[in-house]
């Protein structure tokens, strides 16, 4: 009976393939890979579900950037940077595939509401791709600092961490809003408040950086990497708030005053 058991195991293994890794899943579309559905409304809903997933993947990309910033092992640094590059390529492809799908839906007969939905989602896809671009730009700046053996002071590291926290809060909020069926005034306000915090903190750090460089607290080469990271984070905040504004501007989303 042992031979039969072994044969059974082989058959089951073939019939039930192993669960793909998270990284393998990242390369596949989940909701629109099978093509358009029976109605434009359902197809647009599927595209929006894909956009929610797109947002969540971009959020994970930012998490990888934060890991890269703290990585000190050379081999691990190279591996993490390669993963971020992979995420960037996936992001570019997702933008094109979602936009192409929405454009095909737009070729059919649509209500005015469906037309507005497509326009809104196309705008959102473009902004999320810009968020991913900012993540990649941050990774490249970190790589430049790594190659130049740039060392930051404890204060600079703390400031970068605070800025990362603000941007991460903003991107988490963006994903939350995209998932929600109703847009709350409180969610819009929270996004705008985070954007204001990011802008104000950027301005504060730029001013302090000039003082610190003049006081020789760190070399100018370090300040360039430092400020490039801060400015890129602020740009990311702009793209994130643009996503929320696209939803708020749309007549399709019911806005509750909460």
List the predicted regions and their residue ranges.
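Cytosolic, long alpha-helical scaffolding segments
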Residues: 1-258
């Amino acid at each position: 009976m042992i031979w039969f058991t072994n044969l059974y195991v082989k058959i089951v293994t073939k019939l039930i393939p192993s669960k793909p890794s998270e990284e393998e899943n990242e390369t596949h579309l989940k909701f629109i890979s099978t093509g358009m559905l029976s109605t434009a409304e359902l197809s647009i809903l599927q595209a929006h579900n894909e956009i929610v997933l797109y947002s969540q993947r971009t959020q994970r990309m930012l998490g990888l950037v934060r890991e890269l910033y703290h990585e000190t092992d050379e081999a691990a640094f190279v591996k993490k940077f390669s993963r971020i590059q992979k995420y960037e390529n996936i992001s570019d492809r997702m933008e094109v595939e979602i936009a192409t799908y929405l454009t095909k839906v737009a070729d059919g007969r649509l209500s005015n509401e469906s037309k507005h939905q497509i326009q809104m989602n196309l705008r959102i896809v473009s902004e999320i791709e810009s968020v991913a671009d900012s993540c990649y730009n941050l990774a490249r700046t970190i790589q430049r600092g790594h190659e130049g053996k740039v060392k930051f002071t404890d204060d600079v590291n703390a400031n970068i961490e605070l800025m990362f926290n603000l941007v991460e809060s903003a991107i988490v909020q963006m994903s939350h809003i995209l998932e929600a069926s109703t847009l709350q005034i409180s969610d819009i306000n929270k996004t705008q408040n985070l954007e204001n915090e990011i802008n104000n903190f950027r301005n504060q750090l730029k001013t302090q950086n000039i003082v610190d460089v003049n006081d020789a607290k760190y070399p100018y080469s370090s300040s360039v990497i430092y400020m490039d990271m801060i400015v890129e984070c602020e740009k990311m905040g702009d793209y994130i708030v643009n996503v929320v504004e696209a939803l708020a501007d749309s007549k399709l989303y019911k806005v509750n005053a909460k």
